[in-house]
């Protein structure tokens, strides 16, 4: 495995890619909360995994090294003492857990998972009440009684959008934007990137041009490397102009960056024009059948 990052352009030979294989997070999608979790329908997990595996194998057949986000994070926990405990603290703090006793119950459940890869997958999948044995003091609260009819079985939301791995963090040349994402639903996804770029031996030394604790939001789908010296960024529903200001300052003042100009494209603020990569299509050449008209 080669170390570091190098993406001078979106067009060219792909050598390495980071994916996420759809997992149990899709099983924890409540049908009545799809819109909040940014889904239109509940995918069939088995088919989603089959299609993903086919896609990943096509990449491998073309000589692409396929990495998995869950494996990278698990490798960090395997190799770095204290990293998993640090992650667990932050994960629970950002999980939106309701109830005085529930965070400790969740911690005990997570700590009981010995295998680091299974632990990572569990944090991605979310957690339901049916998975744990809750004492009466935790399961019966004023909040649960008042909201009993509308209360979800979820203790922690799943992260069903994780297979869009470009959005939480995007490579810019030899550095990376670790994004603060538009929605609360997706912003927790960037926590995995934080630990990869903070601790993983292959990626801990790369430059960060944007950090997940920034007050402005941006997503990787709005960032396109045109060439080594030119970066395109969309001003969209998911990326604020102020975020591009922060990004630009960090890129231009970083001695390792080769980017000399950033082009900002103002696109409609709506989900239909979600990102710059939604409204722009890159290709090196177009092939048409000889009988096309």
Predicted feature residues:
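The feature marks the mature, well-folded catalytic cores of soluble enzymes
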Residues: 1-288, 292-293
